[in-house]
């Protein structure tokens, strides 16, 4: 219900597929050359999830292979889906990072409808880890509700129990708290009029983001509590993993 696509593409979100890969790789090369000797990372899931259509496009496989032997180019994407078997035998050379969006059972069941459940995503992540990819988990949006603290603690413990221990050093976390724009709220309520997703602005504070527009975010006290709940738990159960950020 909270998905970016519902507000970016209106009431009928769609997946945009680009078929001009050769041209895109040429553009990417121009950016890489400009930034050398720095390494340039390209994000493959900024506006849509590429995994559900990979069976038709093979875009991810071709992109992973393209960057596998590039000295200065890297690739990454994030998904909520689990059909990753076609990516397991590709020569990735550790140059592609694959991340999975995870959340508590309640969030996935109530507000993440139409996607594979938590355990299916974790099973897919295990396959990716065993295939040698750098991998990660994007926990988000982190939503506060009754007993949310315990649910997120249990989520971290479940992750720790499922990931192959030898791969934890290649694991990263991105922690993203729930936020919404006025446009997002309007669109969500139109598409999901019966939603119980908490969109009450009186419980939020207004904050301008990096792209120049504002969002309703959790107040500092709530943000601090989220940090206190998740960060120590990750450090305790997955000490070799890296926490990239909490926003």
Label every PLM stretch briefly.
Residues 36-40, 71-75, 93-96, 131-135, ...:
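Short, well-ordered coil/turn segments that N-cap beta-strands
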């Amino acid at each position: 219900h909270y998905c970016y696509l519902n507000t970016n593409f209106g009431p009928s979100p769609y997946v945009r597929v680009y078929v001009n890969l050769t041209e895109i790789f040429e553009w990417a090369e121009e950016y890489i050359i400009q930034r050398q000797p720095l390494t340039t990372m390209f994000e493959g899931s900024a506006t849509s999830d590429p995994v559900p259509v990979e069976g038709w496009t093979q875009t991810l496989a071709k992109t992973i292979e393209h960057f596998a032997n590039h000295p200065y180019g890297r690739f990454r994407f994030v998904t909520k889906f689990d059909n990753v078997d076609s990516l397991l035998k590709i020569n990735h050379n550790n140059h592609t990072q694959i991340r999975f969006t995870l959340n508590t059972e309640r969030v996935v069941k109530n507000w993440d409808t139409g996607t594979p459940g938590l355990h299916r995503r974790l099973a897919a992540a295990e396959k990716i880890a065993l295939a040698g990819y750098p991998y990660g988990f994007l926990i988000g949006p982190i939503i506060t509700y009754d007993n949310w603290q315990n649910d997120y603690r249990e989520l971290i413990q479940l992750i720790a129990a499922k990931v192959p221990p030898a791969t934890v050093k290649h694991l990263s976390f991105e922690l993203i708290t729930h936020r919404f724009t006025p446009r997002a709220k309007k669109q969500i309520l139109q598409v999901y009029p019966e939603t119980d997703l908490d969109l009450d602005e009186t419980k939020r504070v207004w904050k301008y983001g990096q792209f120049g527009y504002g969002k309703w975010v959790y107040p500092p006290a709530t943000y601090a509590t989220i940090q206190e709940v998740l960060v120590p738990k990750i450090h305790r159960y997955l000490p070799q993993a890296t926490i990239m950020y909490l926003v």
